[in-house]
């Protein structure tokens, strides 16, 4: 009830169900990632979206790529557009680093795991994207060959 009044008074802006923002707040490039993280609490930003966060490659996905637990129901979101990748065990829990976007701590796979996952899921994103990610990550010194 209080949130409804604040929205009606123009002191808050409703972005999505359960997600509010201050009006006039500048939009960041990764705002959709913060929205998705709030609406999919067990999800982790992965693959093309994680490459974009790390500044690797030239891919600019129009969907938010998120990894969710294997047996979780698929989140039904109208906005932002979501692309779900199912993972389980250590594939889902290892290599997560929180990145703050618009005041929200968003779980994102680190650069090395993201590039490795690009090869694992090359049938979804394409081998050319995986090779570009490896080349660009190595050139930018964001990856090591340990």
Which role fits each region the language model picked out?
Residues 7, 13-145:
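Nucleic-acid-binding surface
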């Amino acid at each position: 009830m209080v949130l409804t009044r604040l929205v009606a008074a123009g002191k808050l802006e409703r972005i999505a169900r359960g997600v509010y923002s201050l009006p006039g707040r500048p939009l960041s490039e990764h705002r959709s990632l913060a929205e998705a993280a709030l609406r999919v609490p067990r999800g982790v930003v992965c693959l093309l979206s994680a490459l974009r966060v790390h500044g690797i490659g030239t891919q600019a996905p129009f969907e938010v790529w998120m990894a969710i637990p294997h047996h979780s129901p698929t989140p039904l979101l109208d906005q932002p557009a979501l692309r779900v990748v199912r993972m389980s065990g250590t594939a889902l829990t290892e290599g997560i680093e929180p990145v703050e976007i618009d005041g929200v701590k968003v779980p994102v796979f680190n650069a090395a795991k993201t590039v490795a996952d690009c090869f694992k899921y090359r049938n979804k994103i394409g081998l050319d994207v995986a090779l570009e990610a490896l080349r660009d990550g190595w050139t930018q010194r964001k990856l090591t060959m340990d």
